[in-house]
Swiss-Prot record:
Species lineage: Eukaryota, Viridiplantae, Streptophyta, Embryophyta, Tracheophyta
GO biological process, one term: regulation of seed dormancy process
Motif LXXLL motif in this chain: 416-420
UniProt-listed PANTHER family: OSJNBA0084A10.13 PROTEIN-RELATED
Keyword line: Gibberellin signaling pathway, Nucleus, Phosphoprotein, Repressor, Transcription, Transcription regulation, Ubl conjugation
GO MF assignments: DNA-binding transcription factor activity; sequence-specific DNA binding
Keyword hit for Phosphoprotein: yes
Region feature (Leucine repeat II (LRII)): 364-396
Pfam family, one: GRAS
Record's subcellular location: Nucleus
The protein's name in its UniProt record: DELLA protein RGA2
């Protein structure tokens, strides 16, 4: 195939006398011979040299890589106003292609501005572009964490490594991958991606190194926000988005949601807290219910405790603090219908937020449950209450009947933590529950500490927690339910990271913290039986064969986790003898 050399013409080069002139009489063979003579000293690629590009054969792979990097950058910088990299800008073909690519990549990622050395901790000789990270988020200890992508990545000369699963670690140096993590105590600089390779290109080939830099950038951005270094945080959040592109699966999704949340906090763009948002969350929760076992586990274990507490009762009443779409109650109604001696009269009071369109959605849920009750021959009473907050409830509103006539159970799934941002809110609700005098009070909450006073600690804990949750979703086949479930979790991340004060409602606490709250309010634990444990384990077998999920009994409570990390906890409570 012949080409007209005019279209490939570059700047004149004294090493090639005929280059840069329109000498149609010279043949390609002559040029190839001239290149061959020069190659004896420079080992230049023949075909590219004919076209006027000087590239050593040994540099071909690097040049190809840099071209890929430049192409990626050119697609990303349009909106940043870097006209010299815009796709519609003309660049004359350079002769020194390798150097030209280096210069272009350097322009895209210029050296960071001078900063106070007090931000650095043990920077050493590294020229890594993220050396402006404040505090110890990057340069902390020598025993840094490195992502264990495969055992083949370990060099033969490396020291032995110990493998462990992610738990409720709050150290800012731990890296969340959603999978197994390896602790490395040697060559820590290389492990955390601070190797002495060129820092100018932010398009990184090695996904493992990218993952390390990504998580450290997330931690550093959170630390900068806590220190009110918003200019550094702004620069880091942009790099987080760029680094996240190189990742796959759960890590990419988690990093993207956390990057959005960090950006909202930096620019003070709080997510909406409106009735429309409540309605959307309700819909998203339905998709989450269909996708994974967490809500099913919550409903099943709570129902089992309620069913046992109602044994032998002729009239029973459930007050549900988390009515939503009423997904929990068909299973309990069917179990009551099959009870030996016949079903009791079942009364249900559902409490939920107002609808965006002022429709009576709680009434609609009640009508559907009434149809089911009629079909299975259960006498059914229902009433719905609309409340902006559970703290607005009063026991007198609930039309309580004497305990000799009607046994009452109170149920709350993922609701009580939302009261912790309102002064006196949780105390008010627990006081109402005490007035109700239920035979059992079932509570399901996220098993994590997201309500501490220090932002960086909350951020670190939430990064671990949601990375594990997203990792557990990776085995689910792709579907609309899965996508919407990820959005459901992403909204929680956004609220937890971007909001403060009463707007921050995702204030999850651990079982021990809740136990202290309930104990000080006059409640004692009601242990869930071994039967609930066995049946919950059987339920999980329906999801991916139960692989990866784990049920654990802890002081009479049941925890569902992914591998060794507990994620949600079901507990049951009753009034202590003193009350």
């Amino acid at each position: 195939m012949k080409r007209d050399l005019h279209q490939f013409q570059g700047p004149p080069d004294t090493r090639f006398p005929n280059h840069g002139t329109a000498n149609t009489g010279s043949s390609s063979k002559d040029k190839m011979m001239m290149v061959k003579e020069e190659e004896d000293g420079g080992n230049m690629d023949e075909l590219l040299a004919v076209l006027g590009y000087k590239v050593r054969s040994s540099e071909m792979a690097e040049v190809a890589l840099k071209l890929e990097q430049l192409e990626t950058m050119m697609g990303n910088v349009q909106e940043d106003g870097l006209s010299n990299l815009a796709t519609d800008t003309v660049h004359y073909n350079p002769s020194e292609l390798y150097s030209w690519l280096d210069n272009m990549l350097t322009e895209f990622n210029p050296p960071p501005p001078e900063i106070n050395n007090s931000f650095l901790a043990g920077a050493g000789g590294s020229d890594y572009d993220l050396k402006a990270i404040p505090g110890n988020a990057i340069y902390a200890r020598s025993d840094q964490f490195a992502i264990d992508s495969s055992s083949s990545s370990n060099q033969a000369g490396d020291n032995s490594q110990s493998t462990k699963r992610l738990k409720s670690c709050s150290s800012p140096d731990s890296l969340v991958t959603g999978t197994t993590v390896t602790t490395t105590t040697t060559e820590s600089t290389r492990s955390v991606g601070l190797a002495a390779e060129s820092t100018r290109s932010m398009v990184l080939v090695d996904s493992q190194e990218n993952g390390v830099r990504l998580v450290h950038a997330l931690m550093a951005c959170a630390e900068a926000i806590q220190n009110n270094d918003l200019s550094i945080a702004e620069a880091l959040v942009k790099q987080i988005g760029f680094l996240a592109v190189s990742q796959a699966g759960a890590m990419r999704k988690v990093a993207t949601y956390f990057a959005e949340a960090l950006a909202r906090r930096i620019y003070r763009l709080s997510p909406p807290q409106t009735q429309i948002d409540h309605s959307l969350s309700d819909t998203l929760q339905m998709h989450f219910y269909e996708t994974c076992p967490y809500l099913k586990f919550a409903h099943f274990t709570a129902n089992q405790a309620i069913l046992e507490a109602f044994e032998g009762k002729k009239r029973v009443h459930v007050i549900d603090f988390s009515m939503n779409q009423g997904l929990q109650w068909p299973a309990l109604m069917q179990a009551l219908a099959l009870r030996e001696g016949g079903p009791p009269v079942f009364r249900l009071t559902g409490i939920g937020p107002p609808a965006a369109d002022n429709s009576d959605h709680l009434h609609e849920v009640g009508c559907k449950l009434a149809q089911l009750a009629e079909a299975i021959h259960v006498e059914f009473e229902y009433r719905g209450f609309v409340a902006n907050s559970l703290a607005d409830l009063d026991a007198s509103m609930l039309e309580l009947r004497p305990s000799e006539i009607e046994a009452v159970a109170v149920n709350s799934v993922f609701e009580l933590h939302k009261l912790l941002g309102r002064t006196g809110g949780i105390e008010k609700v627990l006081g109402v529950v005490k007035q109700i005098k239920p035979v059992i009070f079932t509570v399901v909450e996220q098993e994590s500490s997201h309500n501490g006073p220090v932002f960086l600690d909350r951020f670190t804990e939430s990064l671990h927690y949601y990375s594990t949750l997203f990792d557990s979703l990776e085995g689910v086949p792709s579907s609309q339910d899965k996508v919407m479930s990820e959005v459901y979790l992403g909204k929680q991340i956004c609220n937890l990271v971007a909001c403060e004060g009463p707007d921050r409602v995702e204030r999850h606490e651990t079982l021990s913290q809740w136990a202290n709250r309930f104990g000080s309010s006059g409640f004692a634990p009601a242990h869930l039986g071994s039967n609930a444990f066995k049946q919950a384990s059987m339920l999980l077998a329906l999801f991916n064969g139960g692989e990866g999920y784990r049920v654990e009994e802890n002081n009479g409570c049941l925890m569902l986790g992914w591998h060794t990390r507990p994620l949600i906890t079901t507990s049951a409570w009753k009034l202590s003898a003193a009350h």
